[in-house]
């Protein structure tokens, strides 16, 4: 069993790196197997097909992230009132904890989620929305509670604007922090970036 487990993890690790760098559409199974130094039959054995492999790569993060977000939001909703800042603040620690799933896990996860949209991976959005429906519904409910004036259409667009901002910021975090440190002669870390990001996202979601 050990060799199979090792092979499976190797495939996941290599696929993750290639998907993040080149996207889902431009990464073939042969490219993955070549870099992982395994045969195509190994991918078929462990995952069946490329779509299942894509989902498995994301689910390494999601299975750690979603229960943690759910706990944070349940705690938030024990209160009678809260604002948009506090909704986004509930995501901070769960997202940061992804760095313990994989090195630089938070940025990698956000980049992969972004790839899911830009590469039109409809099956991936379906997988996330069905497997983690309860958590996503709680998140949507929390946003609505924090800003009840939003229409369904406004919520749709603003959530996707928010996602785009997060994906760009986290995926480019190293370059952005280096530029900021050079320009302002001030040390910047990931926590500082998130501290700046949360009020910006909250203001965008609550814009009149």
List where the protein language model places each region.
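Short alpha-helical scaffolding segments that buttress acidic/His motifs in well-ordered protein cores
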Residues: 91, 95, 110-117, 162, ...
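An amphipathic alpha-helix adjacent to DNA-recognition modules
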Residues: 8-13, 47-70, 74-77, 81, ...
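Hydrophobic alpha-helical connector segments
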Residues: 71-107, 159
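Amphipathic alpha-helical segments used for helix-helix packing
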Residues: 90, 101-130, 174-178
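C-terminal peripheral helix-coil segments that are non-catalytic and often amphipathic
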Residues: 97, 130-208
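Helix-turn-helix
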Residues: 10, 18-60
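Hydrophobic/aromatic residues within well-ordered alpha-helical segments
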Residues: 50, 57, 61, 65, ...
């Amino acid at each position: 069993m050990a060799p199979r487990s090792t092979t499976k993890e190797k495939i996941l690790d290599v696929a993750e790196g290639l998907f993040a760098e080149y996207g889902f559409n431009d990464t073939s199974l042969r490219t993955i197997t070549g870099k992982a130094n395994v045969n195509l039959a190994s991918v078929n054995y462990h995952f069946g097909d490329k779509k299942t492999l894509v989902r498995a790569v994301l689910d390494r993060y999601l299975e750690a992230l979603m229960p943690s977000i759910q706990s944070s939001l349940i705690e938030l909703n024990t209160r009678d009132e809260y604002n948009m800042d506090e909704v986004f603040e509930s995501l901070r620690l769960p997202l940061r904890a992804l760095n313990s799933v994989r090195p630089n896990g938070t940025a990698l996860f956000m980049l992969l989620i972004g790839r899911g949209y830009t590469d039109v991976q409809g099956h991936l959005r379906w997988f996330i929305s069905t497997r983690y429906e309860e958590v996503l519904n709680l998140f949507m409910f929390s946003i609505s509670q924090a800003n009840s004036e939003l229409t369904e259409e406004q919520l749709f667009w603003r959530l996707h604007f928010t996602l785009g901002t997060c994906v760009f910021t986290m995926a480019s975090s190293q370059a952005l922090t280096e530029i900021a440190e050079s320009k302002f002669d001030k040390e910047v870390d990931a926590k500082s970036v998130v501290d700046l990001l949360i009020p910006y996202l909250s203001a965008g979601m609550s814009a009149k």
